[in-house]
Amino acid sequence: MPIVRTDEWIEEHPLKRCERLIPYFEQATARGIYLHLTHHGMSSEKGNETVTLMKQKKIWERVETLYEQLRKRWNGPDIPIFIFPSNAHHQAFAHDFNSKGGLAYHDKLFLFLLPHHETKEIAAVLTHEYSHVCRLNKQPKKTYTLLDGIILEGLAEQAVGRFVGKAYEAKWTTYYSGEEVQKFWKKYISPHQSVASSHPLHDRLLYGRGWYPRMLGYAVGYRIVQQALEKESFLSLIELPSERIVQLTSFE
């Protein structure tokens, strides 16, 4: 399935662009999709100049080449990919992710990029998000838990390190030592690992919001998967239940 040529929607306001996405969602409105995508890093501005520069940098073509390579390597599902300019004004997004991000579902993927992103950076965010797609297809559930979420993120960033390079892992992978993460697991994550993704506590723990350590769940998941990879391959872990992955580590 080809990369969707969202660059051809350049003249439209982001909210108008989201009307084109309605067929890809169940019971969704353009405004609902717009709010969801902007919450995860899409720019709320029209951004004609940004899109023009992205076209000049051949962002869409580069993503397509990288995607085909990755899909073949992992034997992953063929899904549509939508590319939009990212929010360059969000300070935390810029600090933690260099203003690049994405959003993955089992049947589609969104990337939020800017003209300055190099091919390796694009490969990193695509690898991260596409690993989510593969994991969600291998472990389909009606309700995902906090444990599922941290393992999902841990697998994704470990994939970046292994398939793109350690230098392209997100900054949050270096925030805490292994000892600190072990303490976080016992104090914050383990007691609430069964919390559903719809529960307000889920995102507070996953992202480390409020008084919780920044990027808490991501950091714990990264270390868990790092240990599990000493015993199993990445493609094997993608297929294992979250609980089984934890059992392969000292976090049990």
At which residue positions do the language-model features occur?
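Conserved binding/catalytic microenvironments
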Residues: H106, L113, Q139
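Post-HExxH zinc-binding segment in Zn-dependent metallohydrolases
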Residues: L113, L146-W185
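Inter-helical turn/loop segments and adjacent helix faces that build the functional surface
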Residues: N137-L146, G165-K171, K231, L235-S236
